[in-house]
C-alpha cells in the first residue's frame, strides 16, 4: 500500500521523500500545473511563494533550528536550499528545478 501525500510544497516534498527513503511506495498529488493559486508562478514542486519562505539560518532562531534538525535527519529541501542559496523569492525557479530533479 502506497503512502499518499497531498501537495508538493516544502512539507509535501519532505514527507514524500522521507517515506520513499524508508522503502515506502509514494503517490504524490499536486494541483499544478493544472491549477494555480494567485501566489504560484511555476509548475515545479516546492515553489517558494513568499520572500521569507525559509526564514533565518541562525540555529538560535526557531526557523534556523528547525532547518538544522531537518538537515541532520536527511532533509531533501534544506541541503538544496543551502546549495542554491535560496534565502529570498526564487523568481528563476532554481530551487524547484533542483527539487524536481533530486535523486
Q: Where are these predicted regions, by residue range?
A:
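Beta1/beta-strand and adjacent pyrophosphate-binding region of the FAD-binding site
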Residues: 1-11
Amino acid at each position: 500500500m502506497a503512502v499518499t501525500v497531498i501537495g508538493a510544497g516544502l512539507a509535501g516534498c519532505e514527507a514524500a521523500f522521507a517515506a520513499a527513503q524508508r522503502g515506502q511506495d509514494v503517490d504524490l498529488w499536486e494541483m499544478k500545473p493544472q491549477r494555480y493559486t494567485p501566489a504560484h508562478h511555476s509548475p515545479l514542486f516546492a515553489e517558494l511563494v513568499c520572500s521569507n519562505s525559509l526564514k533565518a539560518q541562525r540555529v538560535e532562531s526557531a526557523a534556523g533550528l528547525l532547518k538544522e534538525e531537518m538537515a541532520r535527519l536527511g532533509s531533501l529541501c534544506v541541503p538544496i536550499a543551502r546549495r542554491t542559496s535560496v534565502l529570498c523569492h526564487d523568481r528563476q525557479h532554481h530551487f524547484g528545478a533542483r527539487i524536481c530533479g533530486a535523486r
